[in-house]
From Swiss-Prot:
PANTHER family: PROTEIN SMAUG, STERILE ALPHA MOTIF DOMAIN CONTAINING PROTEIN 4-RELATED. Keywords: Cytoplasm, Nucleotide-binding, Protein transport, RNA-binding, Transport. It comes from Emericella nidulans (strain FGSC A4 / ATCC 38163 / CBS 112.46 / NRRL 194 / M139) (Aspergillus nidulans). RNA-binding protein involved in post-transcriptional regulation through transcript degradation. Belongs to the VTS1 family. Residues 1-49, 185-211, 227-246, 257-318, 393-416, 509-542 are annotated as: Disordered. Residues 16-27 have a biased composition (Low complexity). Monomer. Binds to RNA. This is RNA-binding protein vts1. GO terms for molecular function: mRNA binding; nucleotide binding. Residues 230-246, 260-271, 292-318, 398-415 have a biased composition (Polar residues). The gene is vts1.
Length: 611
């Protein structure tokens, strides 16, 4: 019976491919015709064309669309070319508009001043670190600009091998263009790809094309070259009003190909996703556009991976504790103003993602504070004065001891009233009046104009003698200009009026600081109490070199020895500067002595000198 049932299972016709009839059970042969009449294997099965392995409907739709898109590669290449040209022009317009922004110009000026003082190796390292943050579109843009700059440079033909510009650069450019064209969106993502260009969409830039070309000549030349290549290969010039986006207003710095749609209900007004970064529609993507200075922005430049030095390490969720020490305003570790002066600005949120929106506001404040600080430091007499960083490292490593030592030093400075031309120690800040006084003292010291103290007794410039310590400021980390009257230099004798005790102080113009260090009297002194020689002495006026030596102005003998004293006293400030008397203090002293000689001449005291 079992063999009979097995034989009846294959009782369908030979031509049939499949059957929907259930398997036979323990029925007899009388039901065989009934089973045959119910067999539907003669009808074509709707699943007969399906292969053994199932596939999705998307795959069949892609196969169905493929034969009708035979000319798509050429069309897509032309569209990509037009989009690239349009994207370069858009980038150029936005760059020109950003360059005219006053806030951006101020920040850029501060960055350029910082960049100008770097060495060539440091500049190369900085540029290399910045290039690590560029996108693919920016890389292509920079390649075009650098190629144009290299071809226009007069030394490129001498430094490059023969025909490198024709073979090497063009070959690299062709390979790059081929590689970028292969990264285009496939036909399955045409719905999210680049929308068709709308010829009616005009640019909203208010800048003239000649202005943009004048601001960026190399980039404009690269774009013109691209247009010429497109015209040569296609025979049609690219339209000037082409816009690669569906929306009318340009709200981004870059073309729509490097932006992602936001999480909104209507995605038609948003630019399409980037073909180079395969992200989902719901996955957030940070904007690549650089907003204005007043808006929130992502910080740029994680330079630690590029080999640049950083004072403090940075991490994704680092918490920076506030040190106990109160640092001065111009300290390189100024923890009171902003941590941007201590660390490189990270690419991602330094304080974690839990802060959310306040981080963007904080990063904006950090960027503005950094720009303002750079601008302020670069405009203080065109020099930047910073405290020594080693002092703060010692204070930070020894916590309490370093703080107490710094405070004690500051207390001594306040009690003693020492007028140091350098910056104060930790914990003491300068106000505007103190800083102006220190600047005036430094300028007077550099000019060399000092007057002898005329007050009776011990006349000390700056305060009492009690808490003054005769130590070198350089050992304490001061960055000071050399001041001969500073109580901390030269054992403090330069600031004391010691004439009554047999120790002569220096009067008038100090021409050589070595006179203080060696402890000898300036040339022309014959005794500690004898005043300098009279500048109106007729015998001295006949000998200009000796006369200048008596005034401690003998370094200008070669500039003035060809003049008679009658001609010399008629010179004004501008004429003295033209003759090489560059020091302001020397010119002022000469003019003052000239007036004395003129008065003596008017009184008839110099009749012997004119004879």
């Amino acid at each position: 019976m079992a063999s009979h049932i097995i034989g009846n299972r294959n009782s369908t016709p030979e031509a049939s491919k499949s059957s929907l009839r259930p398997p036979s059970s323990s029925r007899n042969l009388a039901t065989h015709q009934l089973r045959a009449s119910a067999d539907m294997s003669g009808f074509p099965s709707p699943l007969s064309s399906r292969s053994i392995r199932p596939a999705s409907e998307v795959y069949f739709n892609q196969q169905a669309q493929t034969p009708g898109n035979a000319e798509d590669p050429l069309d897509r290449a032309a569209q990509q070319w037009l989009a690239d040209i349009d994207q370069y022009e858009t980038t150029l317009e936005e760059m020109a508009a950003a360059t005219l922004d006053q806030d951006f110009k101020d920040e850029l000026s501060a960055i350029e001043q910082w960049f100008r003082v770097l060495s060539e190796a440091e500049r190369t390292a900085a540029l290399y670190a910045l290039l690590q943050q560029t996108t693919q579109v920016q890389i292509r843009f920079f390649i075009q600009v650098l190629q144009q700059m290299a071809k226009s440079h007069p030394m490129s033909g001498l430094l490059s091998p023969a025909n490198f510009g024709e073979k090497g650069i063009d070959a690299m450019s062709n390979r790059l263009n081929d590689a970028m064209s292969k990264l285009n969106v496939d036909s399955s993502r045409n719905s999210l790809g680049r929308p068709p260009p709308s010829p009616g969409a005009k640019r909203n830039s208010g800048l003239d094309s000649s202005t943009i070309n004048a601001m960026f000549p190399d980039a404009a030349a690269a774009i013109a070259k691209k247009k010429a290549e497109f015209t040569q290969q296609t025979g049609n010039a690219p339209p000037s009003n082409r816009n690669s986006a569906v929306f009318n207003e340009r709200t981004s710095f870059v073309a729509p190909t490097i932006s992602a749609p936001d999480n909104s209900a209507d995605n038609l007004s948003q630019p399409p996703v980037s073909p180079w970064a395969q992200r989902g529609a719901s996955e957030p993507q940070p904007p690549i556009a650089r907003p204005k200075s007043s808006s929130g922005q992502q910080p740029m430049g994680q330079f630690n991976q590029s080999g640049l030095r950083s004072p403090l390490p940075t991490s994704q969720t680092a918490t920076i504790p506030a040190p106990e020490i109160e640092a001065p305003l111009l300290s390189p570790y100024n923890v009171n103003a902003s941590w941007a002066s201590m660390t490189n600005t990270p690419m991602t949120a330094t304080f974690g993602s839990q802060l959310g929106a306040p981080h963007q506001q904080g990063s904006d404040m950090v960027a503005n504070a950094t720009a303002m600080k750079l601008a302020a430091l670069s405009t203080v007499n065109n020099r930047i004065a910073l405290d020594d960083a080693r002092k703060y490292r010692r204070a930070r490593s020894n916590d309490g001891q370093g703080k107490n030592a710094s405070n004690n030093t500051g207390a001594q400075s306040i009690q003693g009233g020492l007028a140091s031309p350098g910056l104060p120690v930790a914990g003491q800040l300068l106000n505007a009046q103190q800083f102006a006084a220190l600047q005036a003292q430094q300028q007077a010291a550099m000019a060399g104009h000092r007057s002898r103290p005329t007050s009776p007794g011990i006349a000390m410039q700056g305060g009492a003698l009690g808490p003054m310590g005769f130590t070198s400021p350089q050992n304490n980390g001061f960055l000071t200009a050399y001041d001969p009257n500073n109580p901390l230099i030269g054992n403090g004798l330069g600031a004391l009026g010691m004439g009554q005790f047999g120790l002569s102080g220096h009067e008038g113009y100090l021409s050589d600081h070595s006179e203080i260090n060696r402890g000898r009297s300036p040339r022309g002194r014959r005794g500690s109490s004898k005043p300098p020689e009279d500048p109106t002495d007729p015998n001295l006026l006949k000998d200009i070199p000796s006369w200048l030596r008596s005034l401690r102005l003998h370094k200008y003998t070669d500039n003035l020895k060809d003049l008679k004293w009658t001609e010399l006293i008629e010179l004004n400030d501008k004429q003295l500067e033209e003759r090489g008397v560059n020091a302001l203090g020397a010119r002022n002293k000469m003019l003052k002595v000239f007036e004395q000689v003129k008065e003596a001449k008017a009184e008839g005291k110099l009749d012997n000198a004119t004879a």
